[in-house]
């Protein structure tokens, strides 16, 4: 007769605090909360199925005929699935918007939530930067990119890329 083993895992509460060295708000006490949750989910059939069901619930029936419309080379339904997956698994998502030379939106993509952290607040308590790194546990080997938070105003975008001064 086979024995069944169970294990109870203590899941540490997600703590967000300011890291002066990295100049980011950490995602968990050790800044690895999303990666830890992803590992736990992937090692549990039930958690993985629940994540898939919730993602499909958020997507619903999609956009009908518009499912195959491409935005920046990516199908709308695939973009929607990436957004829904990050919302279900991480309670948030990061969308990167690109502008063309006329400062009009040219395309957009979903950045992996695990790779993104929110930057420092400015004097008006506004988080204007998102920092992106492929491996926050080894930032010496993985460069950190800084992205501006989306703003649809052309004059702000021009200022962010250094075309005009404030």
Predicted features and spans:
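Structured, contiguous alpha/beta core segments that scaffold functional sites
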Residues: 1-166
């Amino acid at each position: 007769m086979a024995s069944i083993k169970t294990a109870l895992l203590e899941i540490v509460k997600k703590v967000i605090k300011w890291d002066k060295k990295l100049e980011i708000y950490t995602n968990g006490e050790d800044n690895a909360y999303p990666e830890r949750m992803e590992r736990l989910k992937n090692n549990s059939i039930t958690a993985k199925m629940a994540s898939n069901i919730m993602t499909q619930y958020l997507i619903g029936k999609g956009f009908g005929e518009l499912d195959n419309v491409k935005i920046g080379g990516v199908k709308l339904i695939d973009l929607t699935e990436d957004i829904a997956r990050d919302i279900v698994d991480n309670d948030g998502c990061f969308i990167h918007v690109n502008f063309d030379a006329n400062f009009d939106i040219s395309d957009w993509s979903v950045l992996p939530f695990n790779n993104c952290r929110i930057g420092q607040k400015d004097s008006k308590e506004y988080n204007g930067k998102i920092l992106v790194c492929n491996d926050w546990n080894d930032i010496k080997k993985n460069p950190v990119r800084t992205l501006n938070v989306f703003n649809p105003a052309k004059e702000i975008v021009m200022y962010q890329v250094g075309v005009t001064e404030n």
